[in-house]
Amino acid sequence: MEDTMKFKDLKERAKDALRENFGAKLRLFLIPIFWGIISTNMTYQSNYNSNMDTVNNFDANTITTGLLLSILIGILIGGLIGLMISVIIDVITVGARFNYIKIYRGERENPRFKNIFTPFKDGSWTKIFVLHLVTALLIGLLTVTIIGIPFAIYLGLGWSQKDYILFDQLESGTYTGIWGVLNASAQVMRGSRGDYFLFLLSFILWYILSGITLGLAKFWTTPYIEMSTIAYYQNLIDTKRNMNQSAY
């Protein structure tokens, strides 16, 4: 019951932070939202087309070396373009999160759409890219084996605050590298991994709604969930700070 009340309070704080000038705050996540909708619908369309194909329509005699090479080159080029787009969207998403942190803390009342591109202007996009790449590789490698999945979940929850930690370190000038960010995130999440997992689980109906509507519900759920997780982070670091102060 205590966790439920705390989660409810954090979500109310998130709503309060979004309530005024919601349109401008929504615009910060428009690119990630539209990309999510496009990706979702492309996946559904691809699965549909695959199901429509049958073995009877495949003729191995029509496959030539030139055709096979063309297909492979097309797949390679498509993969590279997709990777570049994913990196750009990832950086823009983190740029939007940086702005949401400022909004939640009352440091930015009227956000502008161009603010999400700040990481590309100040060069922090490279830090974001490397941070996310290393995290994805390490967690991805652990999920290769069944026995590694629990460790991947443990690390994933421990590193879940990395974007917010990165923002604070960049703002305070204490950034020393990605490992400093990941270690700080793990430190902040010590004793709170299970609690944060339950917090994320409390949004499951919103995730289902987004899936049912083919992503259209994300125009509300994305700002709401993003601001709620920032509220959780702020509450987490405030609690840790108060505990440290009371220890002296």
What are the functions of these language-model segments?
Residues 69-82, 114-139:
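Alpha-helical membrane-spanning segments of integral membrane proteins, especially the hydrophobic core
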Residues 19-20, 121-122, 138, 142, ...:
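Sec-exported extracytoplasmic/periplasmic mature domains
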Residues 21, 66, 124-125, 192:
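Residue-level recognition of alpha-helix termini/interfacial anchor residues
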Residues 2-105:
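Short, small/hydrophobic-residue-rich motifs at membrane-helix boundaries and re-entrant hairpins
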Residues 1-47, 110-114, 149-223, 242-248:
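Nonpolar helix-loop interface/hinge motif
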Residues 72-107, 140-176, 207-240:
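Selective recognition of hydrophobic, aromatic-rich stretches within alpha-helical transmembrane segments
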